[in-house]
Amino acid sequence: MKAGINQIQSYVPEEPVQRVKSKYHLKRLARLSANENPYGTSPLVKEALINAINDGALNRYPDGDASELRALVGQQLNVAGDQLVFGVGLDEIIELVARAFLTPDDQVVVAKPAFSEYALHATVEGAAVKEVPVNPATGHFDFAGALAVINEATRLVWICNPNNPTGVLESPQAIEDFVRQVPKDTLVFIDEAYLDFADDPAKATCLPLVKRYQNVAVLRTLSKAYGLANVRVGFAVMPVALAAILQKIRLPYNLNTLAQVAAVAALRDQDFVKEAAAKNTVERAKWEDFFDQQGVKYFKSQANFIYFTVKNAADLAQTLLEKGFQVRRHLQPDWLRLTIGPAEDTTVMQALVADWLKQQA
């Protein structure tokens, strides 16, 4: 067994909704802990899946190259097909990156806090993980701090943008300024899983950097704004030379036919994504106003969640859970991550949080 495996804790997935409802005797559970799209999935997806099942091809292996999906993503993002690597969610892409590029002699730089799988897969490969705390006042990535810890062993820097769990968005210019100062043999991978929820995704994306730098890649997923968390489709856009390396170790039939069909249908319904993002923006502003009024510290988010801190945060999370609202805890002491739900959930939750805060005063 690899030595690094002994150093990691197993990922704890979300409990099934029915189990949580049964445990707390709930008629309804608003799961606002996993950053899922509360508005469901495009109706085109259901139609496409039914047609695919009726075609009766489930006894055949899927298209190992995801040809239709590859062509559509390439067209929408204006990138070549051989720059794309598809995975079973971004989880697989992150794992592939670690397996392909990291050795026990390498170092990986990540923000603290950041998505846990960056460090997890680096540790599995025996690489050292250097965490650089975000700005405590704003939550922004500390580019100067990251540059200070980069050395000859640094093989990879992860930038989650917007960052999970803080929700903070870095500008493409700030990231490019950083890339220019990073050694050319150090990879900079930018995870844009939540970019669709930003105020202006087209201006916020770092995709143009992939064309300008041979050590930069951008990751995207259909699990969030597209509402396909259950289907598991993610992809990376990278220079052809890097993509070819990942393709060598990717499982040949990793995306099943139903996943490919669902992804194509979802990508073709951009109106659904824009509508979900617009609703999210409205509710996100309500939460920011609420926290401002209540004097609660939070980080300005450009994602579909808000990261905030209160004393006795675990008690607040438990209180909300017993009322049918599940938020994400155990990320940092006294910090909670709240997935932004629909308007009706916002109204009820804010009343519950306000009441809890009064009791704590």
Curated annotation (Swiss-Prot):
Keywords, alphabetical: Amino-acid biosynthesis, Aminotransferase, Histidine biosynthesis, Pyridoxal phosphate, Transferase
Cofactors that this protein relies on: pyridoxal 5'-phosphate
This protein's record includes keyword Glycosyltransferase: no
GO biological process: L-histidine biosynthetic process
Enzyme class, spelled out: transferase
Pathway: Amino-acid biosynthesis; L-histidine biosynthesis; L-histidine from 5-phospho-alpha-D-ribose 1-diphosphate: step 7/9
Residues carrying N6-(pyridoxal phosphate)lysine: 224
Superkingdom of source: Bacteria
PANTHER family in the record: HISTIDINOL-PHOSPHATE AMINOTRANSFERASE, HISTIDINOL-PHOSPHATE AMINOTRANSFERASE 2
Family: Belongs to the class-II pyridoxal-phosphate-dependent aminotransferase family. Histidinol-phosphate aminotransferase subfamily.
Designated name of the protein: Histidinol-phosphate aminotransferase
Lineage: Bacteria, Bacillati, Bacillota, Bacilli, Lactobacillales
Gene that this sequence comes from: hisC
